[in-house]
Amino acid sequence: MARGPHDASPPGSTERHARRRGRRARRVAAAAVVTLAALVAGAGAGNGAVRPAATPTCHSAWTLAGRGAALHDALAARRDVLGERLLAMRRGPTYAAARRLLPPLWYAVGHGGRPLTLSGAYYLPFAYPFTVYGPQAFALHVADGSEIRTRRADGPGLTVFVGDGRERYGSCLARLRPPRLARGWLPVLRTGYADARGARYAQESFAGRIPGIRSLVSFVRLRVDAAHARGAAVVRFVASPGFGARLLADAAGERDGRGVVYRIRGTAVIHVAWVHARANADIVPDGAVYDAARGAVSRLWDNALARGTTFEVPEQRVVDAERSLLVQQRSLAWRYSVGNPYEELSFAEALDAARVTAAYGHADVSEAILRLAVRRLPARYTNWRAGAVLVAAADLFRLTRDRALVDRVTPALTTVLRRLEHQLRGAGPGLLDREPFSSDVTRPVIGLHGQATVWQGLLAMARVWSRLDDPRLAARATWAAERLERALRQAARASTRRLADGSLFVPAALGDRARPYAALTASRDGSYWNLVMPYVLASGLFDPDGPTARGIWRYMGAHGSRLLGLVRARAGRLYGRGPSAASGVDQVYGVNVARFLADADLPDQLVLSLYGMLAGAMTRDTFVSGEAATVAPLRAARLGSMYLPPNSGTSTAFLETLRLALVHERRGPRGAPSGLDLAFSTPRAWLREGATIRVTGASTSFGPVSYVLSRRGDIVRVGLDAPPVPTLRLRLRLPAGMHVRRVTMSGRAVAFDAASGTIRFPPGARGTLELVVGIGP
């Protein structure tokens, strides 16, 4: 995929593991072929052998029937025909409509198309973090309930067998109840399964701690009902060779080599634990131990999320996704992924995560990411990375007002500024030097995306240094930004081509005479253009309401940039070198699309992206994503595949999209904050009868903002706690057919735009404000 600039793998992912990973990957691939073949043939797999299934097929119940042609047509089209279908609905885009169009994501694919797990299913990364600094332990719980792995997908682990003791739990998708999270978002995995003999199982698992054991511990509770099965249920928990001592079981289990066996007639509840590091443990993980550990996990995450901003909307799936993704972001921190070769610092993506977690009130995570990026930048320097660091540092100060953080990173940022000044003072036109297009494309270019990011970062840090009474650094950064801006605008104008449809094509590599792409995903270069151009649009270099930005956006919309509101990509690492129509999505790069959509006030497109992500960019009910995802399933599979999940980038994109729908800062021509727009891009159903939207403590450049919108009948009541802000606006996006009719504040009329539902607060409005809004047909 595009991969923004990224750093080398962290400790624990070093070259000494490479040969072992290669051998393990070959074994995993071979085993997965057996498993997938069993699924296609209508059988479950257990202990390497194909077991007869009680049902004629073990495929997922989801089918392409009636959808295959529509998906093919959508992939071949240059417009977002699926998105346009949802936008044309009277209610606008909804999750229910979006989920019917795309297959659920299920399979985790690595390099060379190899599955990451034995069953091919994705895994969830569970952690019990004590600090966002330094290495962390991770437990990888496979989504079908079949396995738990230690730290890496090829690490030691625990496998669950049921039925006659040889049927892998979850191996028949037709008999697997889809995975969910406890309370909708907690890192506690729940699945259900029926084996080939008719016994039924309900499994819950999570990662936590046991007093006296320093290691992270995974806990499993398995409820078994074999009362109506054809014979006893034989449940086996089997550890990897040489790791049997890490498996702890309750008193009912019988040791059997490196595993534990239960033979059940009737019903039973089983408790086992998997210790992820060597430890002297003689604890029996009974129900009391399990409940205590689970309670601690619940309290940990309740407390962690309570410290940040809360966005409460009248759509539980969106709230669950928000909370689950915040858990993931706090756990992964700077990591692009966990448990696979993508566990690394990827600069642009990690720094986007830092900006978004700061906006959600989790500044400890944001600071950890920024400080690591600053520390690693000298050895991995590119101008794009430097620009991303400048933008993130300025954003963190803007949202937290943490002067101490700026003081800590200013020496490193001064070195960056000196390096940029040296390039800009050269004999050239005022552009920065050529550098690799991205970490995946090493061709040296004058990258508009990287240089626009530097321009944005220089101006942002100039404002920070000015506010902190450092006029010398502020003046130097301003000079560098202005010189770069003049050269960038001139180079962009010289490279721009106007197409017959009135749209504009601006190449990402300036001066290289790139021609417009008829279909962006038909070529590697076009696909990469589509992934990096959002950095330009989000930087503010081009006025989001101006002809250049709108012309580029029109070009993107007519040449295959989006599908169901998601960023399209060639996805060659998933599909291989197939036909151009076999493209996927790469929503990691949707974060900057969302920023542009908010700046350009395109609310319906932002809503489309929100639901597109829930339906097609992450797993349903568990909210795991990869760097890229298929649209049409691979080969004989009915379900979608992801590349090297989990991935923090798509999580960042969803959280930013949700935040921008509810709280958006307007910016001036040079990026300085100029006003607040509240609830400007919400789904219209969020103001249906009886609905309430609540935002608490959202960080902004002007200070925290909180508000409540509550509709009862033909009245919407607004309660707002606003900081001092130059201009303050609120929008009520009502269901189709309803309009704002009158607005009063303390008995006085307030100006509003009936067409858009936008309310303009009087100049100087601040503090506690209350509105009464009358609505009607």
Language-model regions, residue ranges each:
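Carbohydrate-active enzyme catalytic cores, enriched for enzymes
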Residues: 166-167, 462-468, 476-561, 636-770, ...
